[in-house]
């Protein structure tokens, strides 16, 4: 409270990037941090790969922002790669047509994640 920060990224068991092993979120530490930091918005870095249930619980326990940039990047690149290598792509193909499917995929993911944060 003395620092007057709006948000603080905390380490409670996740890391940047996507990993094959399941994140082991330390909920006791999250509760303790929330109790000590009061109104400061807590941020979870490394939300990519965190299960939907864990995300919901993090929000219930006080997390205000969850970063999932790696998931967004991965999906965007996958869709762009498929679109750019399609048989009907020519040098005259509009960028809107090439990037539109990737933008739609990101929109779907963001809507899905936002639904997890509504409790």
Predicted regions and their residues:
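Hydrophobic faces of well-ordered beta-strands that scaffold small-molecule active sites
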Residues: 8-10, 42-46, 64-68
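Alpha/beta enzyme core
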Residues: 1-38, 52-57, 61, 81, ...
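C-terminal alpha-helical cap/extension of soluble enzyme domains
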Residues: 51-119
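Conserved short-loop catalytic and cofactor-binding motifs
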Residues: 17-21, 46, 94-101
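Short, ordered loop/turn segments at secondary-structure junctions
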Residues: 13-14, 46-47, 71-73
């Amino acid at each position: 409270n003395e620092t007057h920060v709006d948000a603080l990224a905390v380490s409670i068991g996740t890391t940047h990037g996507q990993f094959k092993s399941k994140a082991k979120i330390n909920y006791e530490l999250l509760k303790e941090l929330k109790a000590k930091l009061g109104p400061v918005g807590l941020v979870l870095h490394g939300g990519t790969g965190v299960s939907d249930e864990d995300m919901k619980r993090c929000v219930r326990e006080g997390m205000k922002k969850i970063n999932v940039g790696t998931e967004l990047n991965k999906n965007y690149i996958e869709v762009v790669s498929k679109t750019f290598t399609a048989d009907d792509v020519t040098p005259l193909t509009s960028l809107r047509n090439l990037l539109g499917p990737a933008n739609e995929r990101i929109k779907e993911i963001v809507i899905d994640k936002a639904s997890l944060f509504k409790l």
